[in-house]
């Protein structure tokens, strides 16, 4: 670290008695730092520590810590110093508060208990996470180990002798050997430390070339190398993945939470999408298997398989080999057809008549003026039949030789090859035609079903004369119903009913008026039978309601007889006379 000339006396003079000792220490040893480093501490701490009696001892301890830090930084290589000089130095206040507080953290940690900080006004400090429900029995606190969560970088590295100690912790391997005292710089984006990879440097285990390995890549402060640690800001080699301990100091805090507690997922990264930038994730997903990808920070479990939230899901998608088989199966019938077409078509050997036609066709064409092949074939057929047996035998012999030659040239050929192809073509044509017809029919049926409206039976409103339909059926079914209507109420009514019954059944009532008259006659017959048995009693004429439409017009036209008194012997002459006119009307 570059040192300035010690003029500490002037700085301590303005701050009071508490600052005199530290100013003298600064003036006595030049390696304690510049004046501007001590002024904020004296101004801020002096106000609170002046009334207390042990302020001088506390400041003495802080001076010792700072001197050890500065001495250790001076012991680094000359390249580290020169590199640190080239880098723009941040504001001195950003490092003063963590250094001052580090001594307060270190002293109670050595005595195995934690005291309240003497500077409660510092906002960016190490906070003991005593209220987090995820750390009481979680994987980071074996045996009730105390957990300290820090806010953000820059990291202040200390020697391994100043390791955070806790006597109750049985496994010190879970704690880091350096205490990262953190502060959130206001001039940087809050998500800057999470995006740790660049497009240019993806070499496992090697820091950027413009920084030496001895310098912290974030702050520029020289840091002591430790063999058991690897920088979490660079990808790890695949062999070193399983050797990383769980350092508590490297837990990446979540942005926006007041206590910076761990998420319920344990070591899950709070920003899995920001662990690697876009080019890095595409490179990892396309070129590396999941076992070759290093975790984004060493807080992950010590296994070769990274967290699924960090590995891009594109890695898990494997190309499906069965997708090629349908294409092959689709192409197979086409290729078979092409191969069949490529085969040369072997004609069958010529028979005797074909040989004769081949020989005589040119002569017939020369003799005849006809150009049609069908007419020429007919002429050749007539001439073939006109030949004698001897002449035909010559062509039969030629045909036999032709077959022998054909069998020698094509030993595996059979006539089924040619005819089978023709049949296949016919079948395919028929199938295609039937399928096209079926498709046309289905399309027409679908259109018809869409265009058709549901048929609803149209029923006209019933007329009042339709009401006694039940009485019509009962009248025609029972053979003795119209008998009393055609006969007198005397005893020989049975003979008249037998003679007159075919009349009433054969005369088909064509109009509804005639059926209405039949129903009136049936009711009058019932009234006559009841009146002969019981003259004084009320007739059962009104046992069935008589509709007005079914009554004959003569009955409705004579109100004195029927409506005046409802006795049967008064209504009987009118009802008996009406069916006689019905029989005479229906006869002609």
From Swiss-Prot:
Entry text on domains: The putative Groucho interaction domain between the N-terminal CTNNB1 binding domain and the HMG-box is necessary for repression of the transactivation mediated by TCF7L1 and CTNNB1.
One GO location term (cellular component): cytosol
GO function term, MF aspect, one: DNA-binding transcription factor activity
DNA-binding region: 346-414
Composition bias, Basic and acidic residues: 83-101
Record's compositionally biased regions (Low complexity): 67-81, 431-441, 478-497
Region (CTNNB1-binding): 1-74
UniProt-listed PROSITE patterns: HMG_BOX_2 (PS50118)
Organ and tissue specificity: Detected in hair follicles and skin keratinocytes, and at lower levels in stomach epithelium.
One GO biological process term: regulation of transcription by RNA polymerase II
Protein name as it appears in the record: Transcription factor 7-like 1
Bias kind Gly residues: ranges: 1-31
Main localization (coarse): nucleus
Matching InterPro entries: Catenin-bd_sf (IPR027397), CTNNB1-bd_N (IPR013558), HMG_box_dom (IPR009071), HMG_box_dom_sf (IPR036910), TCF/LEF (IPR024940)
Stretch list, region Disordered: 1-101, 203-234, 409-506
Ranges spanned by the short sequence motif Nuclear localization signal, renumbered to the chain: 421-427
DNA-binding as UniProt keyword: yes
Domain of life: Eukaryota
Functional description taken from the UniProt entry: Participates in the Wnt signaling pathway. Binds to DNA and acts as a repressor in the absence of CTNNB1, and as an activator in its presence. Necessary for the terminal differentiation of epidermal cells, the formation of keratohyalin granules and the development of the barrier function of the epidermis. Down-regulates NQO1, leading to increased mitomycin c resistance.
SUPFAM superfamilies on file: HMG-box (SSF47095)
Family stated for the protein in its record: Belongs to the TCF/LEF family.
Keyword field: Activator, DNA-binding, Nucleus, Repressor, Transcription, Transcription regulation, Wnt signaling pathway
Signal peptide residue numbers: none
Protein's cellular compartments: Nucleus
PANTHER family per the UniProt record, alphabetical: TRANSCRIPTION FACTOR 7 FAMILY MEMBER (PTHR10373), TRANSCRIPTION FACTOR 7-LIKE 1 (PTHR10373:SF25)
Quaternary state and interactors: Binds the armadillo repeat of CTNNB1 and forms a stable complex. Interacts with DAZAP2.
């Amino acid at each position: 670290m570059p040192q300035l000339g010690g003029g500490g006396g002037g700085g301590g003079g303005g701050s009071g008695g508490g600052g005199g000792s530290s100013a003298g220490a600064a003036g006595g040893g030049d390696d304690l730092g510049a004046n501007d480093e001590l002024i904020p501490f004296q101004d801020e701490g002096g106000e609170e520590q002046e009334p207390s009696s042990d302020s001088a001892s506390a400041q003495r301890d802080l001076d010792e810590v700072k001197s050890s830090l500065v001495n250790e930084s001076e012991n680094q290589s000359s390249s580290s110093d020169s590199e640190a000089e080239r880098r723009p130095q941040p504001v001195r206040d950003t490092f003063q508060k963590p250094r001052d507080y580090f001594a307060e953290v270190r002293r109670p940690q050595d005595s195995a208990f934690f005291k309240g900080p003497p500077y409660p006004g510092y906002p960016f400090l190490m906070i003991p996470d005593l209220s987090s429900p995820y750390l009481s029995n979680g994987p980071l606190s074996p045996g009730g180990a105390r957990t300290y969560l820090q806010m953000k970088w820059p990291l202040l590295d200390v020697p391994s002798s100043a390791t955070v100690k806790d006597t109750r912790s049985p496994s010190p391997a879970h704690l880091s050997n350096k205490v990262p005292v953190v502060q959130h710089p206001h001039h940087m984006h809050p998500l800057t430390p999470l995006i740790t990879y660049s497009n240019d440097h993806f070499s496992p285990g090697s820091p950027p070339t413009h920084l030496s390995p001895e310098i912290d890549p974030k702050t520029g402060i020289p840091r002591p190398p430790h063999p058991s640690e690897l920088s979490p800001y660079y990808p790890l080699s695949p062999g070193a993945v399983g050797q990383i301990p769980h350092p508590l100091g490297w837990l990446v805090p979540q942005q926006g939470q007041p206590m910076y507690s761990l998420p319920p997922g344990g070591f899950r990264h709070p920003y899995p999408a920001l662990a690697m930038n876009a080019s890095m994730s595409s490179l990892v997903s396309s070129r590396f298997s999941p076992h070759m990808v290093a975790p984004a920070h060493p807080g992950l479990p010590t296994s070769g398989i990274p967290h699924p939230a960090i590995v891009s899901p594109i890695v898990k998608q494997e190309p499906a080999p069965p997708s090629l088989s349908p294409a092959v199966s689709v192409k197979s019938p086409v290729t078979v057809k092409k191969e069949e077409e490529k085969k040369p078509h072997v004609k069958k050997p010529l028979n005797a008549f074909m040989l004769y036609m081949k020989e005589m066709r040119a002569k017939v064409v020369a003799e005849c003026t006809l150009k049609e092949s069908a007419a020429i074939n007919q002429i050749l057929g007539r001439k073939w039949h006109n030949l004698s047996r001897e002449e035909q035998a010559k062509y039969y012999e030629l045909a036999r030789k032709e077959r022998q030659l054909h069998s020698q040239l094509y030993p595996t050929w059979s006539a089924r090859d040619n005819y089978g192809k023709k049949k296949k073509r016919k079948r395919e044509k028929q199938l295609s035609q039937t399928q096209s017809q079926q498709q046309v029919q289905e399309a027409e049926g679908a259109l018809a079903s869409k265009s058709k409206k549901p048929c609803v039976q149209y029923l006209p409103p019933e007329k009042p004369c339709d009401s006694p339909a039940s009485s019509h059926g009962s009248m025609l079914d029972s053979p003795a119903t119209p008998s009393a209507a055609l006969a007198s109420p005397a005893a020989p009514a049975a003979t008249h009913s037998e003679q007159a019954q075919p009349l009433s059944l054969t005369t088909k009532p064509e109009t509804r008026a005639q059926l209405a008259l039949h129903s009136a006659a049936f009711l009058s017959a019932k009234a006559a039978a009841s009146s002969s048995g019981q003259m004084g009693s009320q007739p059962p004429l009104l046992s069935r309601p008589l509709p007005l439409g079914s009554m004959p017009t003569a009955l409705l036209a004579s109100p004195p007889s029927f409506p005046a008194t409802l006795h049967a012997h008064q209504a009987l002459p009118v009802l008996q006379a009406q069916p006689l006119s019905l029989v005479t009307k229906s006869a002609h």
